[in-house]
């Protein structure tokens, strides 16, 4: 128990990341200083003693190493710049006593500001502690923590500590299951004093519960092997099969294999031009062999082949076999006509560019591109053209001077809807006051 309690980060108390010995020597490539111990860097940044063999953990995670290096780098840079300006003031001929006086005043003001900040922080901490704890709880809590550290029976940080959870990515399905479903679905999330909703897994804040739920979903349902994210966990599990399982749907034209059947069907379309899925009598192509066989039967019942079929004996075996190959369409009980399957219906073709479309509606939309020049509305004041009469009238207001001016600022708009959106977005406080 004592060993597991010590194998945590000294600064963020994280035990899942990569831990580094706090007394290891590191060298910052940005600074000119030689290698120094992490404990020395941490002590200079936090102004807390770091000694080997104390009761606190002797490790620090990699992210905290980067953070403390950045802090030490900033402190070192500030000291270097201060020394540089001090040398410049000496070289400029300023009296030495004024230079030292300015430096002393600057240091004195800095010390006073630090003391005032520490005093205010202590007062805030004292007020928070008095609301939640009794006066004697602080001493007893320290004694309890020290006793637990010596015995190795510590399970987590005390309640008085303020933990800032770090952003983590759910790399496996087991880690994704650790996040409760109530946190993303039915649980009512409580906002803080500033009106923001804090993420329970990282330090981000959001203005609404919807944004927070979307963020949690993006954080948890993320693929650990690629940057894809999914709204539902079932879609993530189906996607993980692409990384973990072997493809089961193999193409019988080439050596490719796919995890899903619809992906295989999509791939088979590339073999339509030269594979067995293209009809030998026409240019029709199909995805499955069943569709191709039905299409071939359609060629056998056309009028071109009726002459050869009429010369045969209706009682012969060949005629029976040909009769079996004929497609048996289902008759419509309302008008007595045969209902042809949608895959065998001829696709609509554009008369101008000979393009094929999946539906008549798609063909009509395409025809608008050819007739665009006939339907454009031209402005009577300039050479601009517009698709609709509404856009043309809105444009002509600018020529006639019929504009909408904002009464709060000097902006002018062509459409009254634009003016309303502008007031709502920019002058919302003034509109409410009126």
Curated annotation (Swiss-Prot):
One of its GO terms (molecular function) is DNA-binding transcription factor activity. It is found in: Nucleus; Chromosome. The modification Phosphoserine is found at residues 316, 319. Primarily expressed in ovaries and absent from testes. In ovaries very low levels in germline stem cells and cystoblasts but abundant in developing cysts and polyploid nurse cells. Disruption phenotype: Severe reduction in female fertility. In nurse cells, altered distribution of rhi/rhino, relocalizing to pericentromeric Rsp and 1.688 satellite DNA arrays. This results in increased levels of Rsp and 1.688 satellite piRNAs, reduced levels of transposon-targeting piRNAs and increased stability of transposable element transcripts. Rhi/rhino accumulates near the nuclear envelope in a process dependent on the nxf3 driven piRNA precursor nuclear export pathway. A zinc finger (C2H2-type) spans 197-219, 221-243, 249-271, 277-299, 348-370, 377-399, 404-427. Keywords: Chromosome, DNA-binding, Metal-binding, Nucleus, Phosphoprotein, Repeat, Repressor, Transcription, Transcription regulation, Zinc, Zinc-finger. Zn(2+) binds at residues 9, 12, 61, 64. Residues 117-173, 295-328 are annotated as: Disordered. GO terms for cellular component: chromosome; cytosol; nucleus. GO terms for biological process: positive regulation of piRNA transcription; regulation of DNA-templated transcription. Residues 7-88 form the ZAD domain. Kipferl is the Austrian name of a traditional breakfast yeasted bread roll common in central and eastern European countries. Its crescent shape is reminiscent of the redistribution pattern of rhino protein in the nuclei of kipf mutant nurse cells. DNA-binding zinc finger protein that recruits chromo domain protein rhino/rhi to specific chromatin regions enriched in H3K9me2/3 histone methylation, mediating piRNA (piwi-interacting RNA) biogenesis. May bind to GC rich DNA sequences including a 5'-GRGGN-3' sequence motif. Nucleates rhi/rhino accumulation and stabilizes its expansion. Involved in piRNA transposon repression, particularly in the female ovary during oogenesis. The ZAD domain is required for dimerization. Homodimer; mediated by the ZAD domain. Interacts (via C2H2 type zinc finger 4) with rhi/rhino (via Chromo domain). Dimerization is required for association with DNA and interaction with rhi/rhino. This is Zinc finger protein kipf. It comes from Drosophila melanogaster (Fruit fly).
């Amino acid at each position: 128990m004592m060993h597991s309690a010590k194998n945590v980060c000294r600064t963020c108390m994280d035990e899942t990341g990569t831990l580094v010995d706090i007394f290891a020597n590191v060298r910052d490539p940005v600074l000119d200083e030689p290698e120094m111990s992490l404990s020395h860097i941490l002590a200079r940044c936090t102004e807390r003693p770091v000694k080997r063999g104390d009761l606190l953990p002797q490790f620090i995670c990699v992210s905290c190493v980067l953070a403390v290096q950045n802090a030490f780098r900033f402190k070192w840079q500030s000291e270097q710049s201060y020394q540089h300006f001090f040398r410049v003031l000496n070289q400029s001929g300023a009296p030495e006593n004024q230079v030292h006086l300015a430096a002393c005043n600057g240091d004195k003001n800095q010390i006073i500001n630090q003391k005032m900040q520490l005093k205010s922080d202590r007062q805030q901490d004292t007020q928070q502690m008095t609301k939640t704890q009794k006066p004697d709880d602080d001493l007893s809590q320290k004694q309890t923590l020290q006793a637990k550290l010596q015995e190795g029976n510590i399970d987590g940080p005390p309640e008085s500590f303020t933990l800032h959870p770090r952003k983590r990515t759910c790399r496996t399905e087991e880690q994704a299951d650790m996040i409760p479903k109530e946190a993303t679905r039915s649980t009512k999330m409580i906002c803080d004093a500033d009106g923001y909703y804090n993420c329970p897994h990282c330090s981000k804040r959001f203005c609404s519960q919807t944004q927070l739920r979307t963020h949690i979903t993006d954080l948890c349902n993320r693929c650990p092997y690629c940057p894809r994210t999914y709204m539902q966990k079932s879609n993530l599990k189906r996607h993980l099969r692409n990384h973990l399982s072997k493809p089961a749907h193999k193409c019988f034209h080439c050596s490719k294999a796919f995890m899903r059947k619809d992906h295989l069907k999509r791939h088979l379309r590339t073999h339509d031009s030269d594979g067995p899925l293209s009809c030998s009598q026409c240019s029709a192509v199909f995805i499955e062999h069943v569709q191709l066989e039905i299409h071939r039967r359609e060629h056998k019942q056309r009028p071109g082949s009726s002459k050869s079929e009429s010369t045969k004996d209706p009682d012969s075996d060949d005629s029976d076999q040909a009769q079996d190959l004929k497609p048996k369409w289902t008759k419509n009980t309302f008008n007595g006509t045969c209902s042809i399957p949608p895959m065998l219906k001829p696709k609509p073709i554009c008369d101008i560019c000979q393009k094929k479309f999946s539906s008549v509606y798609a063909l009509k939309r395409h025809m608008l591109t050819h007739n665009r020049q006939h339907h454009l509305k031209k402005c009577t004041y300039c050479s601009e053209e517009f698709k609709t009469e509404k856009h043309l009238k809105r444009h002509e207001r600018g020529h006639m001077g019929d504009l909408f001016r904002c009464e709060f600022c000097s902006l002018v708009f062509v459409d009254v809807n634009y003016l309303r959106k502008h007031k709502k977005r920019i002058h919302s406080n003034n509109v409410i006051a009126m």
